[in-house]
Amino acid sequence: MSHMTPSEIVNELDDYIIGQHNAKRAVAIALRNRWRRMQLDETLRHEVTPKNILMIGPTGVGKTEIARRLAKLANAPFIKVEATKFTEVGYVGKEVDSIIRDLTDAAVKMVRLQSMEKNRFRAEERAEERILDVLIPQPTPNNWDKIEENNSSEPSSTRQHFRKKLREGQLNEKEIEINLAATPIGVEIMAPPGMEEMTNQLQSMFKNLAGQKQKSRKMKIKEAMKLLIEEEAAKLVNQEKIKEKAIEAVEQNGIVFIDEIDKICKRGDVSGPDVSSEGVQRDLLPLVEGCTVSTKHGMVKTDYILFIASGAFQVASPSDLIPELQGRLPIRVELEALTPKDFQLILTEPNASLTMQYIALMATEGVSISFTEDGIKRIAETAWQVNERTENIGARRLHTILELLMEDISYDASEWHGKTISIDADYVRSHLDDLVSDEDFSRFIL
């Protein structure tokens, strides 16, 4: 679980997302409150429930990106789902309970990797011994008798000599034949939508029936060492303890990000039941409020899982959500539409910004690209103008604009090896102004 303070979380998010300070503060406080709750005594801890968040803002302003970056910072079980993928219980489609099952699967994987990392040193020692056993086979009992008679320490000294060479990497390219656990042959079972849990259980059963077999493989020592370390680390892991820790991590620190929640709002002009909108909202209620979900790893309580929902709400409004669900999303944060200045910052400020990506890509062909300040300003203004005149898709417009701008350079890059190209305002105008001025053309191309 992350021990970062709210200001540290916001600073980390600032490296990747421009603006949206209120949304960053809200998720930072929510993440820190997870840690604060765990510091309380057990009696009070059970009374403190997470305050779920609803992020409202137009598409392309950073809602999903905040979720992606938060997942890396949280160091806790995290899953992002699309609200539109679910249907009401009893109808064809995924049920909302699968959110918790997928979250638990993610937690088990996370805890297993952490446990394997803790046991890495012991796993490396075991892997080293297995490789040495192949290079210098251990003497049989009969051979030991002969060695003792000769009063020789040759086997141990030879083994130590090879161990030193192995650790120094001198044997990396040598090929050996080694026995590794064979990957069980998976049985593909096509099941109706909504029955994924049964399918997983059947596949696990068939894998267990196959048993653990070993397969002899020939490979270089460097590659064999990696595979053996993974295999030995997996042997040192206690699967039952992993499941227990994973379920506890989900129940106490789990975070669920539900994107596109506005798409399951029922608008006033629509009549009749809708199994993929209001029905899904009703099914989400017990999860958000707190219930127990059965997973293949055990029963999981959702009382203390943090839910963050987001939506553009361009057609619907938050008030179109059913009242019970509105009440379970008490913290509302509105994200602002992007300005031309924001577009400029998006092009230059974040780590691995779009301009940096194109510079690095063209450098692989030996072409040096530079973006001037007035060129970046013109790109930002163009993106903002197209958003205003057609459909506002936020920062995603920059991908389209830059791809068109760089099309000629990308196509002829191999012929321009060693050249330097400066992308200034004049270059941008000559390549984009005609497209922008033709509204019909820009609507379909940009």
Swiss-Prot record:
The keyword Cytoplasm applies. It comes from the Bacteria. CDD domains: RecA-like_HslU. SMART domains: AAA, ClpB_D2-small. One of its GO terms (cellular component) is HslUV protease complex. Keywords: ATP-binding, Chaperone, Cytoplasm, Nucleotide-binding, Stress response. Pfam families: AAA, AAA_2. It is found in: Cytoplasm. ATP binds at residues 18, 60-65, 259, 324, 396. One of its GO terms (biological process) is protein unfolding. One of its GO terms (molecular function) is ATP hydrolysis activity. The keyword Flavoprotein does not apply. HAMAP family: HslU. ATPase subunit of a proteasome-like degradation complex; this subunit has chaperone activity. The binding of ATP and its subsequent hydrolysis by HslU are essential for unfolding of protein substrates subsequently hydrolyzed by HslV. HslU recognizes the N-terminal part of its protein substrates and unfolds these before they are guided to HslV for hydrolysis. Belongs to the ClpX chaperone family. HslU subfamily. A double ring-shaped homohexamer of HslV is capped on each side by a ring-shaped HslU homohexamer. The assembly of the HslU/HslV complex is dependent on binding of ATP. This is ATP-dependent protease ATPase subunit HslU. It comes from Baumannia cicadellinicola subsp. Homalodisca coagulata. The gene is hslU.
